[in-house]
């Protein structure tokens, strides 16, 4: 990770960002490259969970946020509004990072009840994602750690905390 300052994400749309970027100059004969792994977190989630509907959306090169919006808001794909797509994007990435109904409600300026319904509909749409995430929480609680795609163990000591909020955090990071 890169922070204070985050040199991995220097703004390009602001004049100050453009000025800062000018100080990075490659050695003679070399170039800098830029790689954007489009929706990499969601693609990995599709692979790890084995959710057929999510995998199919990627195989067919569909707009995953519009596809999710269509499913979650029960509207035909061609009728998904920009707001619905934006909200679905927040749900898609929020799920990956363990967002709660409270967190989603804050992000989208909606009620907790609505946010909870969005999350529930997401898991109805992509049930294997729910099973996969639940299995990670179960593993974390039983073993005190979860295992990454490459076999790295990530300890989650929060599961043993007497503090409810800490245990909830453990579930989100699992």
Question: Which role does the model predict for each range below?
Answer:
Residues 70-174:
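Conserved catalytic core of nucleic-acid polymerases
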Residues 1-79, 139-174:
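Acidic, glycine-rich two-metal-ion catalytic cores of nucleic acid-processing enzymes
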């Amino acid at each position: 990770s890169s922070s204070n300052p985050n040199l991995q994400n220097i703004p390009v749309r602001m004049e100050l960002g453009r000025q800062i970027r000018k100080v990075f100059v490659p050695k003679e004969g070399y170039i800098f490259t830029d790689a954007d792994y489009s929706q990499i977190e969601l693609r990995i989630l599709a692979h790890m969970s084995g959710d057929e509907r999510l995998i199919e959306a990627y195989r067919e090169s569909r707009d995953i946020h519009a596809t999710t919006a269509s499913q979650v808001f029960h509207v035909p794909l061609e009728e998904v509004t920009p707001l619905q797509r934006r909200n679905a994007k927040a749900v898609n990435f929020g799920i990956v990072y363990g967002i709660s109904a409270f967190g989603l409600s804050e992000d989208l300026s909606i009620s907790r009840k609505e946010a909870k319904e969005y999350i529930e509909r997401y898991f109805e749409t992509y049930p294997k994602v729910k099973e996969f995430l639940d299995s990670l929480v179960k593993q974390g609680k039983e073993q005190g750690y979860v295992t990454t795609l490459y076999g790295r163990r990530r300890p989650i000591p929060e599961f043993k905390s007497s503090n409810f909020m800490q245990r909830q955090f453990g579930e989100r990071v699992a």
